Amino acid sequence: MRTIALGICIFISSIAFAQRDCATQSYIQEQKSTNPRLSNSIAEVETFIERQKLNARLTGGGMSSAANIIKVPVVVHVLYSSASQIIPDDRVKSQVEALNRDFRRDNWDSINTPERFKSLAADVQIEFVLATSDPKGRATNGIVRKKTSIEYWKSDDKIKFSSQGGDDAWDSQSYLNIWVGNLQSVIGYSSVPGGPAEKDGLVITTSVFGTINVGGVYNLGRTVVHEVGHWLGLKHIWGDYYCGDDLVDDTPVQGNFTPGCPTTFRSSCNNGSLGDMYMNYMDYTADACMNLFTEGQKARMRSLFFDGGPRASLLYSKGLNQPWTEEAPVVEIPVPVAVLYPNPATHEITLNLDDNWVGRLARIISINGNVVSTIKITSRLQIISIGQLKAGMYFLQAESESGKVREKFIKL
């Protein structure tokens, strides 16, 4: 929504948000207040992007041919304080697959793009691949799991440092770092090009990561798609202020974020017959209502990979090479014996267990320690009705030869 200036132009361990709460804008403002040089670095990146845009107009060129598929090595840092927060490999892979579908416009719901926007919808030609080699050249599957004593993370970057209970970034010149943990108040945030290398990457709350055993309205992996957009230099579709500028030429100017999942034409800021592009990945709609990046957004993201750009070094990363040093030591990863979702919940919860639990009893215990319900487990996927419970915090507890399960959940 390139505008002509005339003057001065929550996550509560929940997946049931009224609106998508991306903390990137507030995070960047906070970073600027503590790092005076960051504003200059971000401004330099913006100058670089504008220069590439001008060069493309003058030469009619750009990195857009099918031969120029950019592959980005990815490492996912999973931080967990309880067994239910351990994300298995298939769920991590489902998130990477979701990223690639949306960035390559292979998403099945691309047919839902309104006719007026179809000519603008883009195959960004960027793909994301879990790393095969770590920074020391050892074999990896691109997934790091680490137990932590931190129960809730904030958007203060502590999750990015081992010294503060998190996990240190892999070399951000060679990898996209994604940290996954139990975020408080927000569902995700990202650094932007030009920020400190040791903080570069995105942070996503556990319950919206991936597409397997993920409930609620953010269940298609598009929180990560949205945050990767920020990591590649995109702003929110409304420009982060009323009728603002997102620095992209082909997105209509828009008054504000769009909550929920609209089904009808919406218009703001005199954007005429085009109306609001609320189905853009950089808006706040539910995952099921998002389905496109534009050609302008594509050009902006890909420009960062030109020589001298802040993401250019990723083109030369060894993260997707065959390992070149000794094998990494095998690390025992505890397999979660139970996963409970959704959390919070209103009517029912699902308990995902292994076979050892079938026939056992599970108890729901109030915060005061009283047993309020007892359930016999009859299936590996046990659906438990909680509609009769009063709103509040509860614990689900069970025991078997596999050990003891005690999971906290919120009844809304």
Regions found by a protein language model. Give the residues of each.
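The catalytic-center signature of Zn2+-dependent metalloproteases
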Residues: 216-291
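Active-site-proximal segment of zinc-dependent metalloprotease catalytic domains
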Residues: 155-239
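C-terminal outer-membrane/trafficking sorting elements
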Residues: 336-341, 345-412
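Residue-level detector of functionally pivotal "anchor" positions at catalytic/ligand-binding pockets or at interdomain
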Residues: 315-341, 355-356, 360
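Sec-exported extracytoplasmic/periplasmic mature domains
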Residues: 97-108, 230-237, 306, 310
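Extracellular low-complexity, Gly/Ser/Thr-rich intrinsically disordered linkers
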Residues: 78, 272-319
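Bacterial Sec-dependent N-terminal signal peptides
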Residues: 1-27
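Propeptide-to-catalytic entry region of secreted or membrane-anchored zinc metalloproteases
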Residues: 19-171
